[in-house]
């Protein structure tokens, strides 16, 4: 069964007479039986090549609601955007640590880049976002911070210790390692903090590793040896002005107010058992929610153009068109995406004389 909705997908976006690319990655997937046959890093590379062929001028990588997956695909995917270098550090007990490297010097996209995250971007998503942030390779746009899962778990089957048992003894999941950014900081609990913060309807809901019982604490180790990407001409300026614009946005003020209202409705201390009182409460809520119609009715001015894959032309085109139609409808009301594209609009690259190591073929 093909789980198409979990695979990487892309679209071209027209904004202000410019052409941008969006790649959505819901999960870091891999075929463990045959890594080369299917993995998300290879799929993202294919989408980049497709978008570049059409003249993409900037890239948005959407990691929202991506709960993680294969570490190897994170390393390979980071390598699509940087020259060779460290991607993540892994530390177990004692002073031992392992630095995991991208060893391929080729780059498949060296233009402006934005990464979208939210509170549900976790684990492998955080490793990728953190690495691109530490390298100054991409601007992270989204919730105040990501989920904050910076640990590695191994599952131990207890049945192997007692082979003659008539009962299923189950398994133990044990935390064995922690992930660290290449700058030395952990993503545990604190997650990846966005460069440009955009609230959403869940901003005041308790979501994340820090809201679990007894989470491991944040800590820091020595930085890995890496060189920051220095092609942006105005990175700090774009981040500063982006946050200023968000603070002044009337829609953002509404989103914050709505998020606070949603949080206030969680775990109420009391509920009326009187039907008339309950009915009035529901009516009051309905009237109050009318003030948030601007959020519900929000539409951006983006134009989307989907590029067909060779294999898609052979498959059921009606099903593919229906999927893309649903995706486009969601994107047309996506405020965070539109703000990410504004960042791409403003990012300027330095002109360099030396020849970049850019890969055009796979």
Predicted features by range, described:
Residues 181-359:
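Conserved functional hotspot residues or short segments at active or partner-binding sites
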Residues 19-22, 171-173, 215:
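A residue-level signal for beta-strand positions that form part of recognition/binding surfaces
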Residues 24-27, 63, 117, 174-178, ...:
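Flexible glycine-/small-residue-rich
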Residues 70, 99-100, 139, 166, ...:
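Mature, folded catalytic cores of secreted/periplasmic enzymes
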